[in-house]
């Protein structure tokens, strides 16, 4: 799996396209971290000390998602903690178990992904989150702005609603809203999702987990976001 994973990343990078991933454990990053430009720590791992230590040693910006209950405190604390030196159990380039020593990651930031209580991508939620970061110990992350995950709790796992969320964010960017530095979207070749089944029964390019925005719609949304960013820059 790691061999194929690295080959896919190498092929993507050869196109001049940066790659991102969600970090799940402290071992596999050693195989692919040099091919990743941005990483995420998921909502269920945001409070994990191991993932805070891992993020402190990754040579890329890392986004901590708000907790599944909507709280950003754990993510803010994680951003703060990951900025310091740590040690954690991992492997070296030869595959030997080591105690990895980190230097701290100054580029950690918050990702708003909604919650079990509803979405938090609206302008007021963004403003409040940035304000909360400023008054917390995580003064650095507040300067980086935040990323909005248009999937998960922000769209109710509905790919059509997810596309609408992206359009709403783009409109706000075009009107000059600051603080949003990135957007996440769940996209695949074929829209929607399917239940896991034997390979010969699966639709190629369709998700077997969360519903995804189809590629044609993704292409449109990326152009919409690009135009919105251009408009925001021009307004400065």
Regions flagged by a language model, labelled:
Residues 3-4:
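Short, small-residue-biased leader/transition segments that mark boundaries at the very start
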Residues 141, 147-220, 225-231:
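Catalytic-face loop-and-helix region of soluble metabolic enzyme cores
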């Amino acid at each position: 799996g790691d061999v194929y994973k690295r080959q896919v990343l190498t092929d993507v990078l050869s196109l001049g396209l940066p790659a991102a991933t969600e970090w799940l454990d402290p071992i596999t990053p050693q195989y692919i971290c040099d091919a990743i430009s941005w990483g995420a720590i998921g909502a269920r791992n945001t409070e994990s000390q191991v993932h805070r230590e891992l993020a402190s040693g990754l040579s890329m910006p890392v986004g901590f998602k708000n907790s599944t209950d909507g709280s950003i405190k754990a993510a803010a604390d994680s951003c703060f903690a990951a900025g310091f030196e740590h040690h954690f159990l991992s492997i070296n380039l030869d595959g030997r178990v080591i105690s990895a020593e980190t230097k701290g990651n100054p580029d950690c930031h918050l990702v708003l992904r909604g919650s079990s209580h509803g979405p938090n991508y609206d302008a007021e939620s963004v403003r409040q989150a940035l304000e909360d970061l400023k008054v917390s110990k995580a003064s650095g992350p507040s300067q980086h702005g935040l990323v909005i995950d248009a999937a998960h709790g922000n769209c109710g796992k509905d790919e059509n609603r997810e596309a609408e969320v992206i359009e709403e964010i783009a409109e706000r960017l075009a009107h000059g809203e600051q603080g949003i530095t990135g957007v996440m979207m769940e996209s695949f070749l074929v829209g929607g999702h399917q239940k896991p089944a034997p390979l010969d029964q699966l639709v190629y390019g369709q998700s077997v987990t969360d519903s995804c925005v189809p590629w044609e719609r993704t292409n449109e949304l990326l152009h919409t976001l690009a135009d919105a960013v251009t408009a925001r820059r021009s307004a400065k």
